[in-house]
């Protein structure tokens, strides 16, 4: 799929009233990261998730994911400095940025916040790093970054 069509599909997935650029799958996020040299991935999960579940590995693209928690572990209070932390990581307002969490919920909130602050190219990775639970209540097998076979590493 070309990037123009991919972006159009991502925008079509938005819920009424959403103001960010779109909803992309993990595979689509990878395509954007691969095709656009300035595109960035912000992993909004917690330190515990990065340490125990793993991280996307963007090394073959010459990139690293920015690790900026949307919620701070263990209290899970919202990171009041999130938008500023994203800007401090080098993500400019016009930079295509993919926000990733476990399953697409926290990353959606992150995309909304950054879009409201001026980044018109904020995307939510809808299936997350691990995706939904399967019939055995395990994550990482039905959808998401890991299930798609995209590169990842244990932290």
Predicted regions and their residues:
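Short, surface-exposed ligand- or partner-binding patches at beta-edge/loop junctions that are enriched
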Residues: 99-100
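Rhodanese-like catalytic fold shared by cysteine-dependent sulfurtransferases
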Residues: 1-40, 47-96, 107-155
